[in-house]
């Protein structure tokens, strides 16, 4: 007879299996897409290099710092309850690095590396060019044209209402119309950080004479506060729609089946082609350079002319389809891989904590809230007049006050209406681009 194993004992095979399962479980934990053990090793290497002043003060060292922090903060921001629903990754990626600089956690070696990447090598401008050009060229042309026609009145009405409310409430609290408009209202409705705040900061710096980082720290707080309240308003509109079925299109914006079919058509996703992505890099760089060239003759900041020229080329259908696909694939790669790392760089260099604290106050927050309420309220009532469902119209118009594509996702998720994404993109991209262009022209006019 074989020996009977004692109760509670584990055979060597079972022990090996348990250890293997534990090892696999640990490797299944991820920070972003990186297994936790590997992420830990990478982080330790980078931290030690920075501590012993061996971190290269160039693009390599800069990317190492912003990537290791951006991957971590973006992942954590997507996991924390409540925070994840109000733009957590963006908030953490911008402000945690700012705290690290304020409390001298990051040494001069790390700061030099990030400075060389963001300022000397101008990764910031490269990111802006890829996002703006790729997002515009990648839009469905029919949706772009028809969406602009359909959303023109609600967008214009919402923008006018937001501007009027912001200036009026600002006046009550002692803000000048100039400060309320250019530093509170405009950042909220500019289309996010990458495609709104950053081009704006460049334009403001060229017109007013200070460096772009000065304006980033002044513009970002309004954009983030506006985004948070826009998400809250979207959730409240969902509750209103649940209680009032007559106001609710259940995800349909217009009271016309044919019109909804136009906006819901999807183009087949092209297979990823790295050569086309390379062409996308060339297109993004050239559009940026073209904007700078035109600036010499038109006297409008190059970043704004880049937006206008990309939209004009898309509207005229000039580029071969595969070139547009290359620019769009590059846009998706850059936006999905470098958004949180870039915001880490912005937080380190462009958002001094003391400057941000000096901007935010109770009146400032109330002005931001009034802008969003005016935007969503105008969308509601204009939607009623234009054969749209008021709840959906209000939610789509509300996207104009969110943090770009990230804000669109958060707002539509909070309202349970992800099917409105094509309209949200029109509201955010075209509305944001229009805001940036108009604000720049007006600022030039008032300071000339």
From Swiss-Prot:
Where in the cell?
Cell membrane
Which GO terms of the cellular component aspect does the record hold?
A: plasma membrane
Q: Show the stretches that span the lipid bilayer.
A: 31-51, 60-80, 86-106, 123-143, 153-173, 182-202, 214-234, 276-293, 297-319, 333-353, 359-379
Job of this protein: Acts as a Na(+)-malate symporter, as it catalyzes malate-dependent uptake of Na(+) and Na(+)-dependent uptake of malate.
Q: Which NCBIfam families does this one have? A: ccs
User: What family name appears in the similarity comment?
Assistant: Belongs to the 2-hydroxycarboxylate transporter (2-HCT) (TC 2.A.24) family.
Its recorded name reads: Na(+)-malate symporter
Annotated source species: Bacillus subtilis (strain 168)
What's the name of its gene? maeN
């Amino acid at each position: 007879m074989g020996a009977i194993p004692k109760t509670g004992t584990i055979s060597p095979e079972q022990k090996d299996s348990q250890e293997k399962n534990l090892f696999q479980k640990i490797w299944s934990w991820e920070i972003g897409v990186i297994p936790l053990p590997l992420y830990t090793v990478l982080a330790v290497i980078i931290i030690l290099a920075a501590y012993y002043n061996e971190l290269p003060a160039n693009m390599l060292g800069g990317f190492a710092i912003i990537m290791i922090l951006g991957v971590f903060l973006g992942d954590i921001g997507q996991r924390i309850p409540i925070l994840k629903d109000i733009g957590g990754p963006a908030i953490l990626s911008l402000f945690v690095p700012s705290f690290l600089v304020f409390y001298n956690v990051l040494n001069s070696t790390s700061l030099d590396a990030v400075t060389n990447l963001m300022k000397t090598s101008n990764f910031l401008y490269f990111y802006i060019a890829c996002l703006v050009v790729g997002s515009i060229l990648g839009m469905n042309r029919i949706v772009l044209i028809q969406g602009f026609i359909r959303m023109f009145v609600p967008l214009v009405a919402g923008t006018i209402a937001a501007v009027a409310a912001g200036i009026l409430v600002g006046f009550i609290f002692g803000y000048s119309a100039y400060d309320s408009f250019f530093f509170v209202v405009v950042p909220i409705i500019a289309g996010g950080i990458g495609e709104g705040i950053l081009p704006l900061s460049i334009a403001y710096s060229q017109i007013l004479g200070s460096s772009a980082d000065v304006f980033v720290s002044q513009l970002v707080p309004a954009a983030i506060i506006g985004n948070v309240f826009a998400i809250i308003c979207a959730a409240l509109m969902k509750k209103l729609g649940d209680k009032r079925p007559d106001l609710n299109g259940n995800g349909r914006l217009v009271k016309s089946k044919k019109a909804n079919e136009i906006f819901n058509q999807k183009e087949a996703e092209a297979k990823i082609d790295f050569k086309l992505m390379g062409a996308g890099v060339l297109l993004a760089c050239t559009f940026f350079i073209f904007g700078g060239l035109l600036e010499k003759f038109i006297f409008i900041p190059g970043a704004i002319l880049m937006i206008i020229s990309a939209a004009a080329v898309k509207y005229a259908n000039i580029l071969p389809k595969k070139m547009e696909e290359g620019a769009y694939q590059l846009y998706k790669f850059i936006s999905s891989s470098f958004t949180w790392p870039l915001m880490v760089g912005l937080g380190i260099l462009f958002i001094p904590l003391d400057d941000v604290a000096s901007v935010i106050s109770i009146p400032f927050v109330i002005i931001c809230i009034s802008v969003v309420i005016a935007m969503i309220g105008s969308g509601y009532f204009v939607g009623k007049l234009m054969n749209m469902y008021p709840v959906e119209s209000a939610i789509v118009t509300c996207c104009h006050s969110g943090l770009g594509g990230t804000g669109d996702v958060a707002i539509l998720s909070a309202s349970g209406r992800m099917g409105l994404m094509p309209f949200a993109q029109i509201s955010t991209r075209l509305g944001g681009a229009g805001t940036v262009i108009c604000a720049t022209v007006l600022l030039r006019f008032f300071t000339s």
